[in-house]
Each structure stands twice: as structure tokens, then as C-alpha cells.
């Protein structure tokens, strides 16, 4: 029971950071805040025994650092995407449900490395990522994750719509 509480508290902190990241205007700012949240999520997922998600979160930190370096070689981008998939599959202890974080990370990693100067599209891709993680959270008893993912989804939608007007 203590593991569930700690994991849920980590999710609460991570989601607060993600909500905050959706208010940022540049890719560098968005990814910096998301790196902190990825570390917190990875730690929380260990407590909740969602190991494929932990692997995705920790690889995601490296991915974001590389993504903010405009001079990083393209092979490094694709290597990190492949590393995320491989590590997720190795640490998947939940069958199909354990694939959700892998798919989410794959989708968002490709977005980060291929989307240039389109913060709206990056936020939409992040929205898809958060939705997949919300479903995953249901299965690992991360109740805070489900609730706060829903809040982040709403926050992202508001910021995407606000940018339109």
C-alpha cells in the first residue's frame, strides 16, 4: 500500500510539472520542464511496478536533452527512439498494457525529433502521449495519474485553443 501512495504522490508532482510545461512557449522550455517530470514519473512508476514506463521515462530524459541540441546527429535521434522501444520491451511486465508507455514514448520521440518550429503540433503530440499514459495509469493503480493526466489533457487543449485565437 505504501508503494501505491508514494507512486501516486510522484505522479501528482509530475503532472503539476507537465501542466506548467504546457504554458511554455519554446521547445527548449517545454522539454526542460518535462525532463524534471520524466524523472519524477520514472521514480513513481518503479514504486507502482510499471517498469516499462520507468524505462520510457528515463530514456525520454536523454531524448529531450539530445532534442534541445540542434547540432545532434540524426542517427542519435533514431538510436534513442530504438533504445526506448527495446528497453520498454525488456522491462515490460504487464503484457499489452505495458506496451502503452512504449507506444506513447515512440510517438512523442518521433515528434520531438521531426517537428521544427511548430509548438502547437508538439503540444498535440504531447496530448496523445498523456492520453496513452492515462490509460496505462488505470492498470497500475496510479489514481492520481489518471486524474492529473485528465487535468493535463484539459490544460493542453486550453493552451492549444488559446494559441489559435
Descriptions of predicted regions:
Residues 1-165:
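Alpha-helical membrane-protein topology signature
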Amino acid at each position: 500500500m505504501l508503494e501505491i501512495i508514494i507512486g501516486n504522490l510522484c505522479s501528482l508532482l509530475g503532472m503539476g510539472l507537465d501542466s506548467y510545461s504546457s504554458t511554455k512557449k519554446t521547445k527548449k522550455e517545454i522539454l526542460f520542464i518535462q525532463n524534471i517530470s520524466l524523472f519524477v514519473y520514472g521514480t513513481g512508476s518503479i514504486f507502482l511496478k510499471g517498469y516499462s514506463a520507468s524505462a520510457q521515462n528515463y530514456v525520454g530524459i536523454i531524448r529531450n536533452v539530445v532534442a534541445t541540441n540542434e547540432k545532434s546527429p540524426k542517427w542519435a535521434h533514431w538510436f534513442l527512439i530504438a533504445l526506448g522501444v527495446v528497453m520498454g520491451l525488456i522491462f515490460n511486465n504487464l503484457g499489452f498494457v505495458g506496451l502503452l508507455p512504449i507506444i506513447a514514448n515512440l510517438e512523442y520521440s518521433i515528434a520531438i525529433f521531426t517537428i521544427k518550429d511548430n509548438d502547437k503540433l508538439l503540444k498535440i503530440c504531447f496530448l496523445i502521449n498523456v492520453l496513452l499514459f492515462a490509460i496505462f495509469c488505470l492498470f497500475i493503480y496510479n489514481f492520481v495519474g489518471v486524474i492529473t493526466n485528465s487535468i493535463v489533457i484539459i490544460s493542453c487543449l486550453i493552451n492549444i485553443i488559446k494559441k489559435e485565437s
